[in-house]
Amino acid sequence: MYDETDSQTLVKEIISQDMNLDPKRYDPKKIKRLISNAKNQCLTSNDLLEKADNNFDKTVAEAYKRYRISLSKNNSLDFDDLLLLPVFLLRQNDIVRDYWHKRFKHILVDEYQDTNRTQYELIKLITAGNTEPTKFLNWQDRSIFVVGDADQSIYSFRAADFRILIGFQEDFKTSINDDTKSSLIKLEENYRSSSNILDAANSLIENNSERIDKVLKATKEKGELLTLLSCDDEISEAEAITNKIKSLNNYNQNPIWKNFAILYRTRAQSRVLEESLVRWRIPYTIFGGLRFYDRREIKDAIAY
């Protein structure tokens, strides 16, 4: 079983040695990512080659082909193959497909908005067996139930496609009752956020044309008003946040720092925030990760 490091090393060897290409021009990390995305979209190297309209895309298709051959020679798979190969098997072998179709009669999928095309194909093949889902009629002793929110799709960089959720009812329309309300259940009560936060979120997301319409309603009171802060750069942003924390604490002799939390989108954003907190001598804890200067790659860079 090839992990991410093994796969990356193999792609690098294919680019620099087998194909005799400059890895600075043809970045192995980028090409490995494109191969992974192709697998998550249920695409073969031939599929990529047919779609290629420039030399770089053709190079990716060729690297994908050689990568697959190398894995096969080593009697190995990567993580993406654990989904892709079962899909190919179920597509090609009616007996196997029929067996697993009969084995699983009730399918439940959580976080359906983050499903990729390969996962979607696997679900379809197991659910409908040898019949196209749109033509499958035998739902008396079978069911498929999915849970998701198209407004919360965050894994598009891994080839997840929220449109799969939006198209669910059309894909499995023969399973839907005449009373469509019984087949689509909207969970619109929100127990986490105040109504001011939800009102702002609703006003933004309603501009998205590709979604299942819903309006979140808070069970909590309105809460504090939202504040929009505009800053020139990340340094001034970090300073503004730190100053706000200090002012809210009223510069107490014994401030209670645990009442504050800073949320940020990516790990790289933590550095300037941490530096500002350190400068103001504000203690902090990073949840779900290490402090910026405690990360191995940062330690290595500083030591160098």
Model-identified regions with their sequence ranges:
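Conserved RecA-like helicase ATPase core segment
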Residues: R117-C231, N243
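A basic/glycine-biased coupling hinge at the interface between accessory DNA-binding modules
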Residues: M1-H106, P133-R142, A160-F162, S182, ...
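Residue-level signature of catalytic and energy-coupling elements of molecular machines
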Residues: V11, I35, D78, D110, ...
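Conserved interdomain hinge at the start of the Helicase C-terminal
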Residues: S236-N252
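Core RecA-like ATPase module of SF1/SF2 helicases and allied nucleic-acid translocases
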Residues: N254-Y304
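Walker B catalytic acidic pair
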Residues: R103, E111-D114, D149
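Alpha-helical elements of the RecA-like P-loop NTPase motor core of helicases
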Residues: T9, D98, Y155, I166, ...
